[in-house]
Structures are given as structure tokens and as C-alpha cells.
Amino acid sequence: ALPISKNLILQKIREEERKVVYDQYFEKEKDIVTGIVQRYVGKNISVNLGKADAMLTENEQVKGEVFKPTDRIKLYIVEVKNTPKGPKILVSRTHPELVKRLFEAEVAEVKDGTVEIKSIAREAGSRTKMAVWSNDENVDPVGACVGMNGARVNAVVEELRGEKIDIINWSDNPALLIENALSPAKVI
């Protein structure tokens, strides 16, 4: 009876530990985390997030991005699932929300809500177009996101490994929004 109760206690402890880890990462769902690349598993990448590992699947990787073990990378947590083996954390480097969260971390005006990211169109690894709007007429939304000498946007570009980012002014008028998106080309 003693070995059975010992195993039962150990099993309950492991279950509680898995629940704590699940809860911790469930709170970070739809947010960014920094992970350390562990190894390649086929075409997928195993990433250590601290208390748990995540798998960056091939379809959530940016084409052409190559990581080596010990590289620190920022990831967007798409979903956290509870499984009998512990939490399964689905992460992405291609999700448009990754760009939004990186700007929230880099630009105080975006974080505090003065500047709002209204829309993001992303071709991961190549180009992102982001439409921004300010609820304070004294704050230039594009300028706030670009930063002095491009410092803020360059920090995000660096994290995205050179992906081009176009920041445009948002407009409720679809024709004006399209004109802004196509700039510097002229819409006739």
C-alpha cells in the first residue's frame, strides 16, 4: 500500500505542476514571449520558453529565417492547449499580431493607447503594411511609430530580421486609405 500511495502523491504533484505551467502560459496567450532555440526536430524548431517548451512548426516559421541553438527569438503565442502530457504551446513568427505586439513593446504611445494600430497586412519575411491612427491631434501616429531617426521601427525590423515595414495613416474613407497604402504611387 505504501508504494501505491507514494506513486499517487507523485502523480498528483506532477499534475499540479503541469496545471501551474499551463495557467502561466494561458495568461500569455495572444502575447509575445522570448524563447531560446533548442534544436531542430525535422523542419520544426523546439524553443524553450523558461518553464515550458514550445514547438515552432514549419508553417509558423518565416521562410528563409534560420536559427541556431541558443538564439533568442520573440514569438507570438497563438494558443495554449492542456494535454495529459502537459501544456502544448503553439507559437508563431508569421502572425500579424506579432508585429502589433512588437510595436506595443517599442512605442509608448501604442502601449498607452494614444496611437492605435487599426490594421496590419503582413507577408511574413518580406513586407508589412500597418495603418495607424492617433486619438490625440497633437501626436503624429506615423512619426510616433517610426521614432527619432527611425529608431523605433528599426528595432522592430531588426527583430523581424530585415522585414520591410510601411506605416501609413489610417482613414475611415476607403479611397483615402487605399491612396495612403499605395503611396508614394499616385492614385488616378
What are these regions (language model features)?
Residues 1-188:
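RNA-contacting regions in translation and RNA-metabolism proteins
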